[in-house]
Amino acid sequence: DLAYSYGDRTRCFLKIQDGCDYFCSYCTIPFARGRSRSAAIQDVIKAARDVASKGIKEIILTGVNTGDFGRETGETFLDLIRTLDELEEIQRFRISSIEPNLLTDDIIRFVASSRRFMPHFHVPLQSGSNEVLHLMRRRYERELFAEKVQEIKTLIPDAFIGVDVIAGMRGETPEAFEDARQFIAGLDVSQLHVFPYSERSGTKALDIPYIVPQAEKHRRVNTLLDISEQKLHDFYTAHVGQTRPVLFEESDIAGSIGGFTDNYIRVEVP
């Protein structure tokens, strides 16, 4: 069930897991993609070596619920990344979309001391309001999320943390959104990936009576995007003057080349 796609000449996405058993109230993925399943570690290693032979230097590990890797085989996500860290053929790995309740302290500590896993996390929050998280049927409360961010920043101060957030979920009252906004604004994260809530037939969210008007949903998206822009600016500014390793990926017509630092700062060199 492995698949990979090339994002750039030096980087590719490797899908190590598919499907989901979580049944969040707004989401149809468990119905569309089936139950959670993943490849064996030995097959992931083989796929990584295969893409390395094509000149790929960086792999982003992806999945619907990446941290759920191996649950049906007895292997674990931590087992996987420990094994991949020994793979000489690939310079860099990144972890994409790992649920906060599956982002263990052991995983964070491993990345902090890893040779090949970059100081870069992508963790879905979805809402900064516990009331809305309950309506979403998420498996954590915001306090757990804040603890994970704090753990990352304590062990890896320069880590880039990207966060998924949904705006305008059914049941997200003005008070709940303001509560979420304040919580998110106070998080020491680097960027928000903001999505407007959209209705999905067959989901439990449709049973929630309070509907956010479309114009208000749009306003909330923009409010969160403004927070994201400020956070990304602050993260970049904090690193001005530093020297960090860069994997260059492309060149433009003018001859400049671009790439990303280990902690996911975009740079261009003339």
Can you annotate each of these PLM segments?
Residues 1-68, 106, 121, 143-150, ...:
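Proteins enriched for Cys/Gly/acidic motifs involved in redox and nucleic-acid/cofactor modification
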Residues 36-43, 72-76, 137-144, 172-179, ...:
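Alpha-helix N-cap and loop-to-helix initiation/capping positions
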Residues 69-85, 89, 136-139, 199-230:
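Radical SAM enzyme [4Fe-4S]-AdoMet core and its adjacent flexible, acidic
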Residues 123, 164, 184, 192, ...:
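Hydrophobic, well-ordered secondary-structure elements that form the walls
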Residues 165, 177-186:
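A glycine- and small/hydrophobic-rich beta-loop-beta segment
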Residues 172, 187-189:
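Contiguous mid-protein beta-loop-alpha structural module that forms a pocket-lining wall or clamp
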Residues 207-270:
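Terminal RNA-binding accessory module
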